[in-house]
Amino acid sequence: MKRVTGIGGIFFKAKDPVALRAWYQKHLGVNVQPWGGAAFVWADDAGNAYKGTTIWNIGDANNDYYAPSKSSFMINYRVADLAALLKALREEGCQVLEKTDDSEYGKFGWVMDPEGNKVELWQPPPGQ
């Protein structure tokens, strides 16, 4: 079974998300959108876009989306078959969170790594 197929997103908290987003936009050219992040469209070596994006987002330090992790970041990994991967991780003794989510954005599940970081696993909707 193929497990991780790519990075779907990088999410981190900031004490002053507005100022930090502005810094990234000014100094690194990140095209920060009103929702607080950017979507990097995938391209091949020739620069031709193809289906897939990597999300980059700065959130407020007080949000609890990363709970139970105490980390200031979370990485979202693309996976081919979320249900099969979560089952395999449970069988391997990993701390898989019970909650899953199925929305128009795809299927989501979470596992805690050995250092207490919450890892988001994302199965994109068909066609992505």
Regions picked out by a protein language model, each given a short descriptive name:
Residues 1-15, 35, 61-128:
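Vicinal oxygen chelate
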Residues 5, 50, 69-70, 103:
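A generic fold-level signal
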Residues 18, 46, 81-83, 127:
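Residues that cap or initiate secondary-structure elements
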Residues 28-31, 77-78, 98-101:
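Short linear motifs in intrinsically disordered
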Residues 56-61, 94:
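Short amphipathic beta-strand starts and helix->beta connectors
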Residues 2-5, 11-56, 91:
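Core segments of cupin and vicinal oxygen chelate
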